[in-house]
């Protein structure tokens, strides 16, 4: 059995930029969640890219930047512009270009929009795009995407402190496992402000314990009790 390489080959199409990946993910998501307004206008597409919820990382991009990314996706045939409206509207062609079923497209979409996730998280997050019966069915489609030549997703080794492995898409190019794991650890790390608060709380508790110990020793001396005796017996 071959050992796991440090990086995985990207799809045959060129690697997407982070914003191209976000634009593609938004187009697929909104096709399912707001079908009445799909294909999307540039304004709606930009709003979807800058959405504060269900996005990782959160972006703040302009319509001009989104339009540049659309042009890049057009050259890859991953997106196209509709011709039935006076206002330019855009749609995706990912299923056709990559040759994947809707179930796999739903999983890729969530990975594009939310970053690395476990199979359980993906099942929950894809509910509005496709309802997977159980986690094993999610894993089956992920395994299929990972087994493609070239692979479209990769299963990351479990990072310290994690109970399950996360999956990551490969549409933005090769993934260095060390970098991906470091990113996962950073996400789970305690923020510096919270760490400082914990240190201050520990210091206060230590001082309070010292005051209580001094009070107990004082009362023991007043009552003629050997305080150390209780410590030894306990």
Swiss-Prot record:
Stretches assigned to coiled coil: none
InterPro entries: DUF480, WH-like_DNA-bd_sf, WH_DNA-bd_sf
SUPFAM superfamilies tied to this protein: Winged helix' DNA-binding domain
Domain of life: Bacteria
Cited Gene3D superfamilies: Winged helix-like DNA-binding domain superfamily/Winged helix DNA-binding domain
Pfam family, one: DUF480
HAMAP family: UPF0502 (MF_01584)
PANTHER family: UPF0502 PROTEIN YCEH (PTHR38768:SF1)
UniProt record similarity statement: Belongs to the UPF0502 family.
Protein name: UPF0502 protein BTH_II0990
Organism: Burkholderia thailandensis (strain ATCC 700388 / DSM 13276 / CCUG 48851 / CIP 106301 / E264)
